[in-house]
């Protein structure tokens, strides 16, 4: 199954003897919430879906109990289903040995909330002078979409936000991120780190600037399926998600370099998905090469980039200055595109390690990771 399904029914493989005080009718009236069901293996997902199709809008748990469930999406590359069901029914479903976990489909938000010298600071023009502009490199921007803009060349994309089928940006965040990666060298507006990189608008956050784990996981799956070289995730959540970690791992195994924002709370630990081992975690610095006060730091931080007063593209063919680790992350994604153009045979792991090895040290690895991304050194 490769696309969202309508309301259907699931039944577990085992009959679980669980007593409930509520009736089926009252359970049907309970408000449902979104969950992600992780299975031990892909085959178990198929068996579960077959059980779904064999019943009539209920999951049969025992002779006494039936549970309504709505299947929203079946992932292709990770053994996970996105569903809606009553919170009261989660414990019963978790007793199925084929299910490894059930987690809430948590909200994930952008990493910039306030209103770009950064291109020069990371020495991108020096790489441009060598003929390295990101040409031929595909960069997926998993964000609020990207608005049509005279300073951007958007090659395609997809939306995974319910009710927002267009990849146009109703928020501004994604358009700003896209400009830092690849604003065109066309004598107007601003210049991106990799002005000839191919931008793909992968909408996973709505106009409000928030979205769900399932939308982001679908966006990562799309990136892997469509040959993206780099995925920029200027977003995050304080809570871990097994589904999101699997999606990051799957995309990485398919050649995508996942670059993610460390977070904006200023805390001494980084957000998810940046904290996952296969994501490249990016913190923010100011004009003095100091850690930005809001930039989260700590174990797992890979690298830093400019994230204060960053000028970039904005909806309505305009420009805006924003702050955040969201603004730092695309500097690194753009630098990755430059390195990929210079070394087309390199894997995502090689590119990540090279960016870290060529970064300019700023001091404590706890605060700055390997240091400030350096596009000039990375493309020598």
From Swiss-Prot:
InterPro entries: Peptidase_S8/S53_dom (IPR000209), Peptidase_S8/S53_dom_sf (IPR036852), Peptidase_S8_Asp-AS (IPR023827), Peptidase_S8_His-AS (IPR022398), Peptidase_S8_Ser-AS (IPR023828), Peptidase_S8_subtilisin-like (IPR050131), Peptidase_S8_subtilisin-rel (IPR015500), S8pro/Inhibitor_I9 (IPR010259). It is an enzyme of class 3 (hydrolase). GO terms for molecular function: metal ion binding; serine-type endopeptidase activity. Keywords: Calcium, Hydrolase, Metal-binding, Protease, Secreted, Serine protease, Signal, Zymogen. The keyword Nucleotidyltransferase does not apply. Ca(2+) 1 binds at residues 113, 151, 184, 186, 188, 190. Its EC number is 3.4.21.-. Pfam families: Inhibitor_I9, Peptidase_S8. Residues 1-27 form the signal peptide. Residues 28-112 form a propeptide. One of its GO terms (cellular component) is extracellular region. The keyword Secreted applies. This is Alkaline protease.
């Amino acid at each position: 199954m490769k696309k969202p399904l309508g309301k259907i029914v699931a039944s577990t493989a085992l009959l679980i003897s669980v007593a409930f005080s509520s009736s089926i009718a009252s359970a049907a009236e309970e408000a449902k919430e979104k969950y992600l069901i992780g299975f031990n293996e892909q085959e178990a997902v198929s068996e579960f879906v077959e059980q779904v199709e064999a019943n009539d809008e209920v999951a049969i748990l025992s002779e006494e109990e039936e549970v309504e469930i709505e299947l929203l999406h079946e992932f292709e590359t990770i053994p996970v289903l996105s569903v809606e069901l009553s919170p009261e029914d989660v414990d019963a479903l978790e007793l199925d040995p084929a299910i490894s976990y059930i987690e809430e489909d948590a909200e994930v938000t952008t990493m910039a909330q306030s209103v770009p010298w950064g291109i020069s600071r990371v020495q991108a023009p020096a790489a441009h002078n060598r003929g390295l502009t990101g040409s031929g490199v595909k960069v997926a921007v998993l964000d609020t979409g990207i608005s049509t803009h005279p300073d951007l060349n958007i090659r395609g994309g997809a939306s995974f936000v319910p009710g927002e089928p267009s990849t146009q940006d109703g928020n501004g965040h994604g358009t700003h991120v896209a400009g830092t990666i690849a604003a065109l060298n066309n004598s107007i507006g601003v210049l991106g780190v990799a002005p000839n990189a191919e931008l793909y608008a992968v909408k996973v956050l709505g106009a409000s600037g928030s979205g769900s784990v399932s939308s982001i996981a679908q966006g990562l799956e799309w990136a892997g399926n469509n040959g993206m070289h780099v995925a920029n995730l200027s977003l995050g959540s304080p809570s871990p998600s097994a589904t999101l970690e699997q999606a990051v791992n799957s995309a990485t195994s398919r050649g995508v370099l996942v670059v993610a924002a460390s977070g904006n709370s200023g805390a001494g630990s980084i957000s998810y998905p940046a904290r996952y081992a296969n994501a490249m975690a990016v913190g923010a610095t100011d004009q003095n090469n100091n850690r930005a006060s809001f930039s989260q730091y700590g174990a797992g931080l890979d690298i830093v980039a400019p994230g204060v007063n960053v000028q970039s593209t904005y909806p309505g063919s305009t420009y805006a200055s924003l702050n955040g680790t969201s603004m730092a992350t695309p500097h690194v994604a753009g630098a990755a595109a430059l390195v990929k153009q210079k070394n087309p045979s390199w894997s995502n792991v090689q590119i990540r390690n090279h960016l870290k090895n060529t970064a300019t040290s700023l001091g404590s690895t706890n605060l700055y990771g390997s240091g400030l991304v350096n596009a000039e050194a990375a493309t020598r």
